[in-house]
Amino acid sequence: MEEILKSFKISIDNEGYSKSFSLEDLDNFNNNNNNNNNNNNNEENNPYEFFERYGFLVIRNVISEEDCNKTVGEIFDIIESKVKTFDRNDQSTWDQTFSEDGSSIPQYGSPSKPPIFKKQFLMNRTNPNVYKVFSKLLKNQDLMVNHDRACFFRPTLVNPKWKTNDNVHLDMNPYNWMGNGDICREELSKLTYARLGEFIVENNQPTQNDGLQLQGVINLLDNQELDGGYCVTPGFHTIFNEYFTSKKPQYTSPSWNFDKKDIAFKYAKRISMRKGSIVVWNQQMPHGSMSNKSFNPRMAQFIKIFPTSTVNSVRYQHRKNQIKSIIENSDELKDFPLNQISSQLLGLN
């Protein structure tokens, strides 16, 4: 297994960013796995063959610069609302960035532990380009979007104490995923969304019976390798079953963390991306983040889009009621533009 992971190399373009594709590339090629002939030249040009082989895909220019800037502003709004001494324009005030009341996750750079419901965050979740990326890879247009967190990595060359924890993990229990799905369905059936944290819980209950499941990160600033951020273990999806059948099963945790000595951690690669890019990966892929080692901050929004067919009618209604209530009771969301795509993705149909 180690030799397989060791064989994967990620090319870097002439601006120092990891291999990426355009939205047009998604249209210019067909997503037909039967045409995969393992030709490395095709993988470099065809986004679907690249995704099939590597297990992840970077698409550039998905979110506009203006929308990225608005999202960055909303992240700073969250921080400044919690930490009164923090000033986004003065790095000397960044020593205390994360609130001490348990509503942040400082070790991973998350200013908000609950999912974020701000206008631009919802605009990004329902952005037609984002929807296009997921629908093309899933070969499915009947999709819904999750509600997740964001991250802010401070520049550690300004202050080494701002370092976040390196981590590689799965947002699922691999043994429940490989099972018949009963455990996952039971957990999902308990969700009423009375607590906002239940929107996070739903992310971690995929099953192989649901087919391909995708996660993503929307990159909000130019992000070079030393700026820290997203990492993934290319090709791991090809050895997923073999790897976990060689381990002692454990069914209780909703996620799986890899030790630094593990091959999944050892062969994880930092994926550098331009502002406005999105990286999407097969949920079977070990992924996580590496800490910042530069003068530049990192900001990103987390996202998952999944087939509506994986949500039963009772849970759909609970979810719909909560989303509708959140929008109607928020001054900044009352005028949120609902159309065919956004209503479908938010589960408001």
From Swiss-Prot:
Q: List the disulfide bonds.
A: none
- Role noted for this protein: Converts phytanoyl-CoA to 2-hydroxyphytanoyl-CoA.
Q: Which organism is it from?
A: Dictyostelium discoideum (Social amoeba)
Instruction: State its cofactor.
Output: Fe cation; L-ascorbate
What Pfam families does its record include? Answer: PhyH (PF05721)
**What are the GO MF terms of this UniProt record?**
metal ion binding; phytanoyl-CoA dioxygenase activity
Entry protein name: Putative phytanoyl-CoA dioxygenase
Organism placement in taxonomy? Eukaryota, Amoebozoa, Evosea, Eumycetozoa, Dictyostelia
Q: Which InterPro entries match?
A: Phytyl_CoA_dOase-like
**Residues the record lists as binding Fe cation:** 169, 171
Q: What is its EC number?
A: 1.14.11.18
Family recorded in the similarity comment: Belongs to the PhyH family.
